[in-house]
Amino acid sequence: GNKIIKIMDLAIATGVPMIGILDSGGARIQEGVIALGKYGEIFKRNTMASGVIPQISIIMGPAAGGAVYSPALTDFVIMVDKTSNMFVTGPDVIKAVTGEDVGMEELGGARTHNQTSGVAHYLAEDEVDAIDYARALLSYLPENNLSETVVYAAEGELEITDEDQKLNTIIPDSPNQPYDMRSVIESIVDGHEFLEVQPLFAPNILIGFARVDGRSVGIIANQPQQMAGTLNIEAGEKAARFVRFCDAFSIPILTLVDVPGYLPGTDQEWAGVIRRGAKLLYAYAEATVPLVTVITRKAYGGAYIVMGSKQLGADINLAWPTAEIAVMGGQGAINILYRNEIKAAEEAGEDVAAVRARLAAEYTYNVASPFLAAERGELDGIIEPAATRISVIKALRALRTKRSSLPPKKHGNIPL
C-alpha cells in the first residue's frame, strides 16, 4: 500500500499519467483495518488525481472486494478477455447469501463489464492487446491538465477529395433506413483512424479519440445502426463521462448528430431517465473546450438540445441539407397537427397513406428544415456533406484560442 501511495503522489506532483496493472485478490485478511486504511488512501489519491493526470487501469487478473474501486475511479479500464474479473462480492458469497448460482466470468468477467455494466472501456484479446490499447490512448492525451496534446505536423488538406465525396451519398433516401456513422467519422479524421472507447457498451452512441488537422479531438456520435440512434440511459451516461474527461484535459469535442429522440418505455422512465439523462446535458453545458456540432439527419426534441446544441454552449453548429430539426418527427407531428385532415381523408375514402406522406413532407419543409434553423441563428451554416472534413478543420482552427470560464463556485451538483 505504501509503495502504491508513494508512486501516486509522485505522479500527481510531476504531472504525468498514471497506469495501474491490477491482479489482486483484495485486502489481506490478516492485516485487518490497516489494509483497509491503505485502500482508502489509494481511493483518495485516485480522486485527487482525477482531472489532473490521465489514469488508466489494466485488469490482468482478479480484482475483488474493495480493490475494484480504485480502477472504477480511473478514467479508463481495460480488461483482458477470459482472464480479468472484477466484482465487489464473489460467487461463493453470493451463493451463501442469496442462493444464486453464478460463475466468475458471468458475474464479473471482461465481457460482462464491457457489454453489460459499462465498467470497462475496452475488451482486450490478450495482455499484449491491452497494453497496446493503453499506449494508443496515451498518444491522444496530454500528460496533465496544464499541458497540451502532441501536435502532429500533417495538416488537413483544404480541398474536397474523392473520399470526401462519398459522404454526399451516405444518407439513405428513407429517413428510417440506417447507415454506419463510423464511416462518417473515418472520412473526417486524419488517416481514417478512430480509437473507439466502450465500443460494446451502449452501441447506439459512439465515443472515442481521433486527430483532425494533426490535433487530438474527442468524438461523440449517434449510431443509427443501433436502436435507430436513440438516446437511452446507458448512452447518455457513457457520453456524459466522455465529455467531462475531454473537458478536463482541454481536448476539443466534435459531435455528430442523428438522433430521433430518447428511447421510450417504462423501463427507461422507472430507471430514472430524467435524472440520469440530464447528466449529458449537464456535461455539455459545463464544458469550456471548443465544441463543434454537425447534424447529419435527425435532431428531434430534447435529444437535439442534449447533443451539443448551440443553446448548451456549442461554438459552431453546422448541418447537412438532409438535417431535420424539430420538436418531433413528421409522422408523429402530423398526428397532432393534422388529425382533422387525416380523419376527413379516412371518412372520404381517400388514400390515407398518401395524405399522411404529403402532410409529413409539408411539415418537414415548413417546420423541420435546417434552412429555417439557420435563418433564425440556431445554426452557423448548412454545408455539403463532402465539405464536412474541411468545415470541421476550419472550425477547430478558429477555436484554438478560445477562452471560456465558469462562474466561481466550489463545484456543481451534477445529477448523479
Regions found by a protein language model. Give the residues of each.
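Ligand-binding clefts of soluble mixed alpha/beta catalytic domains
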Residues: 1-416
